[in-house]
UniProtKB/Swiss-Prot annotation:
Region (Disordered): 1-30
Protein name: Putative autophagy-related protein 8E
Transmembrane segments: none
Lipidation (Phosphatidylethanolamine amidated glycine): 87
Location in the cell: Cytoplasmic vesicle, Autophagosome membrane; Vacuole membrane; Cytoplasm, Cytoskeleton
Length: 87
């Protein structure tokens, strides 16, 4: 993947890959799915951002993909953050 990014000249725009696997989910509750995969403890909130935007909670992954996919390579790039919550 890193070689492909360098060939396309996208190294500076996207940075280095994180090494996380890519899964395909068309209808899922993304934050709950990711909390399980990342082994986040109860009481920790997960926030997923796409293009510096927090998508609507009820929005399906297919809709998020169609709205925010990269026009160059067709991938959906996500950033996530966790925060401890009370309760």
């Amino acid at each position: 993947m890193e070689e492909r990014r360098k060939e396309k000249g996208k190294e500076g725009r996207r940075g280095k890959a994180t090494g996380h696997s890519v899964d395909k989910f068309s209808r899922s509750n993304l934050p709950e799915m990711e909390k399980r995969k990342l082994h986040l403890p109860p009481g920790t909130a997960l926030f997923v951002f796409v293009n510096n935007t927090l998508p609507q909670t009820a929005q399906l992954m297919g809709s998020v993909y169609e709205s925010y996919k990269d026009e160059g390579d067709g991938f959906l790039y996500l950033c996530y953050s966790s925060e401890k919550t009370f309760g």
